[in-house]
UniProtKB/Swiss-Prot annotation:
This is Acylphosphatase. The active site is at R12, N30. It catalyses: an acyl phosphate + H2O = a carboxylate + phosphate + H(+). Keywords: Hydrolase. Disulfide bonds: none annotated. Belongs to the acylphosphatase family. It comes from Synechococcus sp. (strain CC9605). Its EC number is 3.6.1.7. The lineage of its organism: Bacteria, Bacillati, Cyanobacteriota, Cyanophyceae, Synechococcales. Residues 1-83 form the Acylphosphatase-like domain.
Length: 83
């Protein structure tokens, strides 16, 4: 979960591009409470790089907190923006 000013700043689209560049699969979506949720699978180094990016976000974002959690692996081979 990503908290702060993370909606209406292009966070989902930018996260999608970054994940694809890193070869990560999963998804990103806005939540009704103003947070952004990301589910990502990939090599540990790529996941670390995506997390580091999420801690800053795109221009205009002000990330306050990134809360990671372990989820079951889905085996998906794409990354998408969910609505």
């Amino acid at each position: 979960m990503i908290e702060g000013r993370v909606q209406r700043v292009g966070f989902r689209a930018s996260c999608n591009r970054r994940a694809l560049d890193l070869g990560i699969s999963g998804w990103v979506r806005n939540l009704s409470d103003g947070r952004v949720e990301v589910q990502a699978e990939g090599p540990p180094l790529a996941l670390s790089e995506l997390r580091a990016w999420c801690e800053v976000g795109p221009p205009g974002a002000r990330v306050v907190r990134v809360t990671p959690s372990q989820l079951p692996i889905t085996g998906d081979d794409w990354f998408e923006v969910r609505y």
